Amino acid sequence: MHFSLKNLIAFLLLIAAATNAQTVSVLHEKKTNPSDLEVSGALTGLPTDSVRYITREELLAMPQVTYTPSGDTNFSGPTRIRGVRLEDLERALSVSPSSEMVVAVCDDEYRANYPQSYLAAHHPVLVLEINGKPPSGWPKDAQEHKFDMGPYMVSNPKFVPGFKIHSYVEEPQIPWGVVRIEFRDEKTVFDAIAPRGLFAQDREVQNGFSIAKQNCFRCHNSGREGGQKSGLTWDVLSQLARFSPKDFAAYIHSPINRYAKAQMPGFPEYDEATLAALTSYFQTFSKQAKP
């Protein structure tokens, strides 16, 4: 049988459409099991910000990777991980996998952000099994040894920091207690915390922005974007940075000493240059002159 180039392209597009339809068909409108993973955002074949669910069994039927992680602080000793790469999950479910970022949302409203640059560099994995066991057999959290790390978590096969800004070194994004995966437009998400005003492009402001995207944004929110675990919004942080830079720096170094309800760890390793960059960045959200 002879196919013209035009017919061949049409045939391939038909196959692609069928594949996408097949992918969307596995998503469910309602959650029927505690282990069902919520997915939302730009889902193929659905209106923007739709919410659907995918079962653990369906995730296990997707292409899997198996590895022993290196440098993952959630684990002590040799650990065998099995799961689905976030890139593969995005390709299967997202409308625009080449431009969408992945956001992992935890049961305590902590969020880990995976822009395209992170996905390409570190290939994070949605963990389905640890040492051959489902979440009920997983170890407790590494910090307090009392919290379940399921129903899902994210790990990196081998994390090698890709950049360093002053004393800040790129951090692995390895949340546990993950209950939702979002596929979001990267520009929209990060525009919510892009520096404001005349000095937005200042080098140190941009340095602070790069750090805040990876660190602060996990627990602090600006409107609907960002984590809400801390209870302190971007506006609160910006006001603190503007009116009391010393207290702002002290909060970063040791949160619990400045805010009794603080849950985030301190960052005593941040040097003056790192703190100055963060301070300059957050000050751009307040009405004032040069930060």
Language model features: what each stretch is:
Residues 1-9:
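Bacterial N-terminal signal peptides that target proteins for export
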Residues 12-21:
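Hydrophobic h-region of N-terminal signal peptides that target proteins for export
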Residues 23-186, 291:
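Structured, non-membrane catalytic/scaffold regions adjacent to prosthetic-group chemistry
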Residues 75-83, 95, 201, 205, ...:
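Solvent-exposed, acidic/flexible segments
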Residues 85, 204, 212-218, 223-224, ...:
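Short pre-active-site segment immediately N-terminal to redox-active cysteine/selenocysteine motifs
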Residues 187-211:
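Electrostatic cytochrome c docking/interface patches
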Residues 209, 217, 221-251:
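Gly/Gly-Pro-rich "capping" loops immediately C-terminal to redox-active cysteine motifs
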Residues 229-237, 253-285, 289-291:
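Axial heme c-ligation environment in periplasmic c-type cytochrome domains
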